Amino acid sequence: YINYKNMSHQHTLMLFNLLPVGSNISTWWNFGSMLLSCSMIQIMTGFFLAIHYTANINLAFSSIIHISRDVPYGWIMQNTHAIGASLFFICIYIHIARGLYYGSYLNKEVWLSGTTLLIILMATAFFGYVLPWGQMSFWAATVITNLLTAIPYLGTTLTTWLWGGFAINDPTLTRFFALHFILPFAIISMSSIHILLLHNEGSSNPLGTNSDID
């Protein structure tokens, strides 16, 4: 039995140089494209949430309630954005685990661009976690940003600068919202570089053979 449909599909991809990988890859190689889908969902839902969100310590939580209750389909946007973030991390950890297991780290440029992406993603998620300004948001902002004080000489100055004062307050929330809004564009840029480098070098496969073997 020969799957001609699958063969023609692969041939089309190879014709346009869109498949820098052997045909022996497994399901574990799906998570890269799934991460791109997650990015698109997060950016679209995030944009609609940002329209109705208010970056003020007295109004932030109320604006979240307003999105859930009053904005048409706001509850879908909010839940999709929150659950989508968890899905994003599930996909990225599986993506990294596959890379570790099959030795993708040998492709240094792709691996380092991916590491940079993970750091930016974790920072973006942290800033987003703070935005509802609930009890846990306040606690997270205090604890995580306080880690900066461990840096010798510069720590206290850096923390004060990040907070916008001597304690977490309105300026902190405003800049966290600005960072949460701008960092996804850095993620898009780094993702483009990540994919460009991957297509330049070629992906790994379960056997560790050359990407152009077939």
Swiss-Prot record:
Keywords: Electron transport, Heme, Iron, Membrane, Metal-binding, Mitochondrion, Mitochondrion inner membrane, Respiratory chain, Transmembrane, Transmembrane helix, Transport, Ubiquinone. It is a multi-pass membrane protein. It is found in: Mitochondrion inner membrane. Disulfide bonds: none annotated. Binds 2 heme b groups non-covalently. GO terms for cellular component: mitochondrial inner membrane. SUPFAM superfamilies: Transmembrane di-heme cytochromes. A ubiquinone binds at H199. Its main location: mitochondrion. GO terms for biological process: mitochondrial electron transport, ubiquinol to cytochrome c. Signal peptide: none annotated. Heme b b562 binds at H81, H180. Gene3D superfamilies: Cytochrome Bc1 Complex, Chain C. Its cofactor is heme b. The chain crosses the membrane at residues 31-51, 75-96, 111-131, 176-196. InterPro entries: Cyt_b/b6_N, Cytb/b6-like_sf, Cytochrome_b_N_euk/bac, Di-haem_cyt_TM. It comes from the Eukaryota. Heme b b566 binds at H95, H194. GO terms for molecular function: metal ion binding; ubiquinol-cytochrome-c reductase activity. Pfam families: Cytochrome_B (PF00033). The cytochrome bc1 complex contains 3 respiratory subunits (MT-CYB, CYC1 and UQCRFS1), 2 core proteins (UQCRC1 and UQCRC2) and probably 6 low-molecular weight proteins. Heme 1 (or BL or b562) is low-potential and absorbs at about 562 nm, and heme 2 (or BH or b566) is high-potential and absorbs at about 566 nm. Component of the ubiquinol-cytochrome c reductase complex (complex III or cytochrome b-c1 complex) that is part of the mitochondrial respiratory chain. The b-c1 complex mediates electron transfer from ubiquinol to cytochrome c. Contributes to the generation of a proton gradient across the mitochondrial membrane that is then used for ATP synthesis. This is Cytochrome b. The gene is MT-CYB.
